[in-house]
From Swiss-Prot:
Binding site for NADP(+): 23-24, 47, 114, 158-159, 180, 207-213, 256-258, 262-266
Top-level taxonomy: Eukaryota, Viridiplantae, Streptophyta, Embryophyta, Tracheophyta
Organism: Arabidopsis thaliana (Mouse-ear cress)
Gene: AKR4C10
Residue numbers bearing the Phosphoserine modification: S295
UniProt-listed Enzyme Commission number(s): 1.1.1.-
EC top class, as a word: oxidoreductase
Chain's role: Oxidoreductase that may act on a broad range of substrates such as ketosteroids, aldehydes, ketones and sugars.
PANTHER family: ALDO/KETO REDUCTASE
Superkingdom, natural source: Eukaryota
Protein name according to UniProt: Aldo-keto reductase family 4 member C10
Family listed: Belongs to the aldo/keto reductase family.
Keywords: Acetylation, NADP, Oxidoreductase, Phosphoprotein
Record's keyword annotation contains Zinc: no
Length: 314
């Protein structure tokens, strides 16, 4: 019998459900139905962010699900993220309060620094003049206060390289519980995964299918012949194999879909596994990062190159 891998334990002792519904690029008007369908299918983990612009709609649906007795608040694991315009320590609690208000919650289970980048307060877009020097230790102190208050049951980071995570661990009183990064068979993050594991930081993978629904990212992750071959042998879809690979590598996965049939398919990853001989073939897959963060790279930015933004993990 395959090991189900329904949860991973965080360094706080809390359990994070291994499959969460991603809501990035989920259009308002569709995201509510997606969350409703996902929870009824069995998802207990919803990945949100203020910058996605859909937390209000998600909040309305969550309230309806809680009020209707479909699921209890304590059975759900809700993540949100601090956007780059709120890195000033005084802005951090305000940002979370706004998210809590929109989601109609008293607390989030996980609150992440979305990017290791500071943008001018109130700015939209990524004009070079909006990119400020970063002070992650100060922002993290404010995050620790949210953890102390109970409004964020766990805190963590997103899009942090091994080096940036190592630097934060040196100064952190409360170590990050999670580093959420792009991760899929065509961007496996082996160096970062090993580092996170060695420090007790859980790796969570966004775009685990390579963002097939986006128009501005060219993604052939699911068309990879190795993935296709394994899927065929196991009688599964390439998407299911990509997700199950993530679970077997020890990371939670956050597939995004607004189609009920795919939301259901993406959850069918528990009662089977990829045999070791097939798993080893994944090391032959060519690697390439899709979400590169070019918007944050400029000669006047703290990051003059992608090399600097990712500290060589590119």
């Amino acid at each position: 019998m395959a090991e189900e891998i329904r949860f991973f334990e965080l360094n706080t002792g809390a359990k994070i459900p291994s499959v969460g519904l991603g809501t990035w690029q989920a259009d308002p008007g569709l995201v509510g139905n997606a969350v409703d369908a996902a929870v009824k299918i069995g998802y207990r983990h919803i990945d949100c962010a203020q910058i996605y612009g859909n937390e209000k709609e998600i909040g309305l649906v969550l309230k309806k699900l809680f009020d209707g007795g479909v699921v209890k608040r304590e059975e759900m694991f809700i993540t949100s993220k601090l956007w780059c315009t709120y890195h000033d320590p005084q802005e951090v609690p305000e940002a979370l309060n706004r998210t809590l208000q929109d989601l109609q919650l008293d607390y989030v289970d996980l609150y992440l620094i979305h990017w290791p980048v500071s943008l001018k307060k109130g700015s939209t877009g990524f004009k070079p003049e909006n990119i400020l020097p970063t002070d992650i230790p100060s922002t993290w102190k404010a995050m620790e206060s949210l953890f102390d208050s109970g409004k964020a049951r766990a805190i963590g980071v997103s899009n942090f390289s091994s080096k940036k995570l190592a630097d934060l661990l040196v100064v952190a009183r409360v170590p990050p519980a999670v580093n959420q990064v792009e991760c899929h068979p065509s961007w496996q993050q082996n160096v970062l995964r090993d580092f996170c594991k060695s420090k007790g930081v859980h790796l969570s993978g966004y775009s685990p299918l390579g963002s097939p629904g986006t128009t501005w990212l060219t993604s052939d992750v699911l068309k990879n012949p190795i993935l296709g071959g394994v899927a065929e042998k196991l009688g599964k879809t390439p998407a299911q194999v990509a997700l199950r690979w993530g679970l077997q590598m020890g990371q939670s996965v956050l597939p995004k879909s607004t189609h009920e049939d795919r939301i259901k398919q993406n959850f069918d990853v528990f009662n089977w596994s990829i045999p070791e001989d097939m798993l080893s073939k994944f090391s032959e897959i060519g690697q390439g990062r899709l979400v590169r963060g070019m918007s944050f790279v400029h000669e006047t930015s703290p990051y003059k190159s992608l090399e600097e933004l990712w500290d060589g993990e590119i």
